[in-house]
């Protein structure tokens, strides 16, 4: 069994428990684990220390994301490189033979650069140019499988390798969706760790945790419940399952033994059957 674990970058997320669980899975249980990490909060904090205001834009479809100009891209690379090294060192300290890499290494995450993005400003649709972001179209699963076979635990992160005419350039991409594409390519279980227990039917009420999503009707309810940042995680869930992952779990990074707890039933569990159309379901009956 291969498990892909995405460690979030929010201020409220402590990676210590997750790193301990990765060590348990990799060393004690001899299971394959790939770690993917974010770091958006650290990027914002670094920009602010430099006197630069982080810029977020809204697309016409209502999705809010970072606008990554050239200066922000440089900070992004610096911050993510630092975070990656810290996580690798943390795992090495626990006896895990971890290897750090980003999406540019070996074209781990590859796709076209989006230099221009459609945005919604003051109720009007506009095109913003100069963005350094990309859309993942390919995952170098062979690279990860080679590392896993040789006993290493990959620790991966954005940026991705963006195709820009005849060049390959580092560009920003969402860490949740990076983890989704990697888990799909490896036919793995994806654990998305965040700063809440899972996905709530009522976003303001933790007692409404959605524990299991296995049918198209339950999937519709999940999509309706996802608001704000959780909406982006649901997009990642869909991409992972559509790409080949067998299950996605959204769980609390700050729980005791967060990964082991998630794999044992904690959090919100979404199965690939939730994305089957009604025609697919009826054909199987």
What are these regions (language model features)?
Residues 2-60, 72-285:
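C-terminal catalytic "cap/lid" subdomain
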Residues 60-66:
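Active-site loop-to-helix "anion-binding N-cap" substructures in soluble metabolic enzymes
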Residues 69:
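An acidic, glycine-rich surface segment that forms the CoA-thioester-binding/catalytic face
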């Amino acid at each position: 069994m291969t498990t892909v674990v995405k460690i979030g970058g929010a201020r409220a997320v402590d990676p210590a428990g997750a790193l301990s669980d990765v060590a348990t899975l990799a060393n004690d249980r001899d299971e394959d684990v790939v770690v993917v990490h974010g770091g958006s909060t650290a990027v914002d904090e670094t920009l602010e220390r430099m006197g630069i205001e982080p810029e977020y834009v809204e697309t016409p479809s209502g999705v809010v994301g970072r606008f990554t100009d050239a200066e922000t891209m440089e900070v992004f690379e610096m911050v993510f490189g630092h975070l990656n090294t810290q996580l690798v060192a943390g795992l090495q300290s626990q006896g895990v033979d971890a290897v750090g890499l980003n999406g540019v290494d070996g074209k781990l995450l590859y796709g076209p650069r989006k230099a221009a993005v459609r945005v919604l400003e003051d109720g009007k649709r506009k095109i913003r140019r100069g963005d350094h972001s990309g859309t993942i179209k390919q995952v170098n699963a062979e690279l990860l499988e080679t590392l896993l076979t040789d006993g290493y635990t990959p620790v991966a992160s954005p940026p991705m390798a963006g195709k820009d005419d005849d060049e390959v350039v580092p560009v920003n991409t969402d860490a949740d969706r990076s983890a989704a594409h990697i888990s799909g390519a490896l036919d793995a279980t994806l654990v998305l760790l965040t700063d809440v227990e899972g996905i709530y039917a009522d976003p303001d009420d933790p007692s409404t945790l959605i524990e299991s999503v296995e049918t198209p009707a339950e999937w519709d309810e999940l999509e309706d419940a996802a608001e704000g940042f959780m909406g982006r995680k649901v997009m990642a869930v869909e991409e992972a399952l559509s790409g080949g992952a067998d299950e996605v779990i959204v769980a609390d990074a700050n729980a005791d033994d967060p990964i082991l707890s998630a794999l044992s039933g904690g959090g919100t569990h979404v199965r690939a059957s939730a994305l089957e159309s009604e025609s697919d379901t009826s054909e199987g009956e």
